Every structure is written in C-alpha cells, then in structure tokens.
Amino acid sequence: SVTAEKDRLRSGLGYARLILPIWGAFLNETIDDLTVQFEENGQVIVNELDKVVLSKGAWTTILFRYQQWQPEKDCFGPDMYVIRRYKKAGGEYRQQSKFNISSADQARKIVDALSSWIN
C-alpha cells in the first residue's frame, strides 16, 4: 500500500522519487531524475541542496546534500549528506544501497582520510 511504502521510506530506507511510480508520479529514467527531495501534502520534508554524480553507467553513485524539515522547530535542520548507489534496469534507476554521513564531523573525517590517501 502507499501508506506502507511511505512508512518504509521514513524508517530510514530513504526518500527518493524512484519509489514514487507506485504513487503514479515519477519514473527515474535519467540521472537527472534521481533526487532525495521529498514533499508531503505540499510541505517539503527533505530539501535537496545539491548533488554530485560520482559515477555513471549501469551502476550510478551520487552524493547528495540535503536538509530535513523539523516540524518541532518549524524550520529545516542542519545540512546532511548521503551517498546512494543506483542500478539501471528495465529503463529506470533503482536504489540499491546508501550510506548516510551522520554529521559534518564525520564528513570532515572522510575528506581527511581520502585526502591523506590520495596525496
């Protein structure tokens, strides 16, 4: 059911338009269609700020920067980050996995580690 699918999304498996064909809204036929932006009843719940495509092809990896709506504060929370992997099958992209970067501090540690390995 649509309600069960929305609950599954909210449980941490991800907000993405790729699920919305169930609701008759979008298909993810191109990389540009992939997003973490999510609205409910006209209210933006997840506001995508930016995305960087890390790899393209049958398997696509995207880094998203976003904010989540905090109804108790009536504003968006701090910037958050997620890396998602998509597989293109049957003409559309489907999310296969994700890694949530839990804080700006964790993001800095990832950047520092990669920088030290690459340089």
Tell what function each PLM region has.
Residues S1-F26:
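Short, Lys/Arg-enriched N-terminal segments with co-localized hydrophobic residues
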Residues L18-R108, D112-N119:
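Positively charged, low-complexity terminal tracts
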